[in-house]
Amino acid sequence: MSTGKIIQVIGAVIDVEFARDNTPKVYDALNVVEAGLVLEVQQQIGDGVVRTIAMGSSDGLRRGMEVKNTNAPISVPVGHGTLGRIMNVLGEPIDEAGPIEYTEKRSIHQAPPAYDELALSTEILETGIKVVDLICPFAKGGKVGLFGGAGVGKTVTMMELINNIAKEHSGYSVFAGVGERTREGNDFYYEMKDSNVLDKVSLVYGQMNEPPGNRLRVALSGLTIAEGFRDEKRDVLMFIDNIYRYTLAGTEVSALLGRMPSAVGYQPTLAAEMGALQERITSTKTGSITSVQAVYVPADDLTDPSPATTFSHLDATIVLSRQIAELGIYPAVDPLDSTSRQLDPLVVGQEHYETARAVQKVLQRYKELKDIIAILGMDELSDEDKKIVDRARKIQRFLSQPFHVAEVFTGNPGKFVSLKDTVASFKAIVNGEYDHLPEQAFYMVGSIQEAIEKAKTL
């Protein structure tokens, strides 16, 4: 184990000098013995000097401190010992419940599975959320992105998905909290504990207060644990909140390392870094990883390089819209912007496909008519268009749904709606079977039966 000494400290970037014939490799983990800090080598500058990024706070470091090379990348424990535990980027427990028992540690830097090992699945995962099951269904082993600006409900929607899928799903789940609020991580831990599924979940947190090196690597640590379960021939759920913070940490690290910024100030290696993470989140012939990733959209601009780079890696995209949230319709999913590769008659069946497209057609026509209504009013529309507007407003309200995880805020008990009921209900609304019910009856209900009951009280 070779030793070196710190020669420069610039915030999270630390230069360390080693003997020239003992220069550490890129991605090697170094230990600052006195401070108990781990550094990761990012660049070899020459003459035995390496530029590293700190995995924790660099407060209190000074030049001349001794640094040991571990001769290996950062490694985290994998396997059953990680279940029910909260870990940091280094795989160390941060829940004060004693050490983690493990038989294997894996490097967080792994090559993605080879092309011939990949496996595709068209099995649909039922989420119990009407708008998701109808418009952008999930595939088992697929990748789903939740896109949305600040405060439109990404984390709540993700928590509901975790609640509905992880509780129904008998396999294991891994949750990586990347640069998000510590409070949300805390809430999530107790939510899992109260619902007795904590023993099936591994939690890896690197929250907002951590330095950029930590936030850049914590997604990889979580993914390594998920890969460990996948290689044990299991089906794993992987939740990442938030992918944007991973990109942002990469931007900060890139600037600290002195690289030339590219569009909008992002790192020049944005696509490569995103690819390195996303290509590993995949299903092989041994097991599957189904991932749900929250993606923050800066200033509600979906063309921003970060969300735009993420789009290309996903099978399904759920776009949350501020306009829909302003109407008080939650989950604020935009049914015209959200897409799924699984919405195909060969996968979901002809009836589901035609119903989803009919719903989108009605909503699209309503969107086109809005300008006419704003200028001339409803009276100028033809009878056919009046019917379409009426149905579209009912569909819009029926796409809302009370969530289990939001029960404490709204007082409405959460609802899980089966896919069969969802398709049948929307088909009936589009066909005009419920034209006699007032539109208020469709707001914040689960099944169509509830809407019928609610109409009687209005």
From Swiss-Prot:
Reactions catalysed: ATP + H2O + 4 H(+)(in) = ADP + phosphate + 5 H(+)(out)
Lineage of producing organism: Bacteria, Pseudomonadati, Pseudomonadota, Gammaproteobacteria, Thiotrichales
Location (main, coarse): membrane
The protein, known as: ATP synthase subunit beta
Matching PROSITE patterns: ATPASE_ALPHA_BETA
Record localization: Cell inner membrane
Membrane topology of the entry: Peripheral membrane protein
EC number: 7.1.2.2
Xref: SMART domains: AAA
GO CC terms, sorted: plasma membrane; proton-transporting ATP synthase complex
Gene Ontology molecular function terms on file: ATP binding; ATP hydrolysis activity; proton-transporting ATP synthase activity, rotational mechanism
Keywords assigned by UniProt, alphabetized: ATP synthesis, ATP-binding, Cell inner membrane, Cell membrane, CF(1), Hydrogen ion transport, Ion transport, Membrane, Nucleotide-binding, Translocase, Transport
Subunit: F-type ATPases have 2 components, CF(1) - the catalytic core - and CF(0) - the membrane proton channel. CF(1) has five subunits: alpha(3), beta(3), gamma(1), delta(1), epsilon(1). CF(0) has three main subunits: a(1), b(2) and c(9-12). The alpha and beta chains form an alternating ring which encloses part of the gamma chain. CF(1) is attached to CF(0) by a central stalk formed by the gamma and epsilon chains, while a peripheral stalk is formed by the delta and b chains.
InterPro entries: AAA+_ATPase (IPR003593), ATP-synt_VA_C (IPR055190), ATP_synth_F1_bsu (IPR005722), ATPase_a/bsu_AS (IPR020003), ATPase_alpha/beta_chains (IPR050053), ATPase_F1/V1/A1_a/bsu_N (IPR004100), ATPase_F1/V1/A1_a/bsu_N_sf (IPR036121), ATPase_F1/V1/A1_a/bsu_nucl-bd (IPR000194)
Source organism superkingdom: Bacteria
Residues where ATP binds: 148-155
Database matches in HAMAP family: ATP_synth_beta_bact (MF_01347)
Naturally occurring in which organism (per UniProt): Francisella tularensis subsp. novicida (strain U112)
Gene assigned in the entry: atpD
Family classification: Belongs to the ATPase alpha/beta chains family.
Function: Produces ATP from ADP in the presence of a proton gradient across the membrane. The catalytic sites are hosted primarily by the beta subunits.
